[in-house]
Amino acid sequence: MKFKTMSVHSGQRIDPQTGALTTPLYQSSTFSYFNAQAGKERFAGQAPGFIYSRFGNPTTAELEQKLAALEGADEALVVASGMAAVSAIMYALADSGDEVAYIGPLYGGTDAFLKQTFSRAGIKITAYESDQALLANIRPATKVVLFETLTNPTLKVVDPRVVVEAARKVGAITVCDNTFLTPYLLRPLELGIDIVMHSGTKYLGGHGDIIAGVVAGSHALMKSVRTVALKHIGSPIGPQEAYLLQRGVKTLPLRMDAHLHNAQKVADFLAAHPAVKKVIYPGLASHPGHDALGAFASGFGGMVSIELEGGFERCATLLDNLQLFVQAVSLGDLESLACHPASTTHAAMDEASRLAAGVNDDLIRFSIGVEDADDLIADLAAALALL
């Protein structure tokens, strides 16, 4: 079955009593197990059935089946946020004394979690600047390797195939944050990655109306992640959010095609504009990761970053004069968004680490929406003319 068909039909069950095509919203915190023996068996994991919505909900379960199919995974888990996803993964897979490696930069919230919270559990955090640096220098004590396929916000390409090669040298578990590409453009598990995760808030949801996280992988790994996420940390997604995320995923291919088309046109325009110092978009032949990404993914994503001369003040002038682009963090919405990462999404990083990661004061990140590309270009042209 092709991806577009799976995005609509996978995990969807026509209700046998009513014939309803849409998954109902089961707004129930607890579920009856009807007799004591059935309750005993459900709590022991010996019989199927729902107990309590923190552990699972019928609306959520159908969404998880759809996401597992789209990822090519044994199973998927949806949780309250992308940060809930990454924290559950890390706590499930690493123990005190282990080492966790990552390829930077990461999303600022993930970076802060690893360095300020997770490290307090007695876990060593080691950063690498590229997949090749990881391959050459990975340490034997490494238990988990975390990376983003396109780094946020510098859009550096990290090759999952190289990460897998490096991790297998020391027996480490690989975790790929594929938020920027989605399973429509890349299915990391097919390249040997162990666990894939997303901020479901972004492209998967696609409408800017939910907060969600997604994790997918093998039964063996997901059993531990599910236990930590739902039973120990207690970060389930609500049924309303699950309902909306399932609806959003159905249109993922259509929306991603529009994001990609617009991002390429916007990047081409910006690359030719004299006021722009640098354009960062993997779809440009000038991007150092252009060929690599083209070899393992089926598209270059909907994110474009630029650098201007003049630091925060000049970036603010551009941002404040945009009319269609909305100044806001997050990404993957229908609307085009723009932000200054150094002062927003990555402000929690210490300055030295932030600058070393390429998140400088000249950088602006655009999430290109699904509006008409000509209108977006006109908006950018008018704002750039005021610099």
PLM feature spans:
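N-terminal "arm"/small-domain region of PLP-dependent enzymes with the aminotransferase-like
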Residues: 1-57, 65
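Positively charged, small/polar-rich N-terminal and surface patches that mediate targeting and assembly
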Residues: 2-4, 10-12, 58, 216, ...
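Glycine-rich beta-alpha junction loops
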Residues: 12-14, 27-33, 180, 202, ...
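Conserved N-terminal alpha-helix of the aminotransferase class I/II PLP-enzyme fold
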Residues: 35-84, 109-116
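PLP-dependent enzyme catalytic core of the Aspartate aminotransferase-like
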Residues: 115, 124-126, 320, 336-387
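Short, well-ordered beta-strand elements within core beta-sheets of diverse protein domains
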Residues: 244-254, 302-309, 365-369
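Conserved small-domain helix->loop->beta segment predominantly found in fold-type I
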Residues: 264-335, 349-355
